Amino acid sequence: MANNLCGIIEGGIDPDLVASRLSSLGWKTESASWSSSEAETRWCRIEIDQTDDGTTLINGVIDPQQIDDLSRLFARLGWQHSLELSDENGSVVQERRY
């Protein structure tokens, strides 16, 4: 399946910290590069990266039925965020903001 999830975590949170927090909740995590991490659970796989200006980006694949769960999880961790779920044509079909 092609990537269907993209988003931003506000506040310039380091990708390693995002991965560490998700790991403590049972997600499988690993370093993807010098500046990015990957996190995976049975219903979602994301890459977490940080741009030169400090914006924390996420993108990956999620079971569309779980986007609310991911948004609630990020909110519970205190992360302001925006998430976009796209269909197979790349059109945004759902958005979540906290």
What residues fall within each predicted segment?
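A general secondary-structure signal for short beta-strands and their flanking turns/coil
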Residues: 2-4, 55, 76
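Ordered hydrophobic segments in well-structured contexts
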Residues: 6-8, 57, 82-84
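Intrinsically disordered, low-complexity regions enriched in Ser/Pro/Gly/Gln/His and often acidic
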Residues: 20, 36, 72-73
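Short secondary-structure junctions
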Residues: 23-33, 81-83
